[in-house]
Amino acid sequence: MEPFFIEIYPDKDDERKTISHQGEEFILVLKGELMVVYGRETYYLKAGETIYYNSIVPHYVGAHGDDPAQLLAVTYTP
């Protein structure tokens, strides 16, 4: 498992691309708001909220709104 501190800036709508890869991801939002597209679902997370998912499913993670988001991400790759 690898932990990361990440600051994400908002993307333009046409720059939002989903990715998929082996492994699992856990995200804790520290500041701001985050948009997570996971398969066909979209989740909006605020500071203090978390999400955990299998990263083989196509996903996108980006800041929601006009301000950057700060997060702690922990990834596992077999």
Name these PLM-found stretches:
Residues 26, 40-44:
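Short, surface-exposed secondary-structure edge patches
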Residues 2-21, 41-42, 55-58:
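Conserved short histidine dyad/triad with adjacent acidic residue
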Residues 2-4, 25, 32, 57, ...:
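A generic structural signal for short beta-strands and their flanking turns/coil linkers
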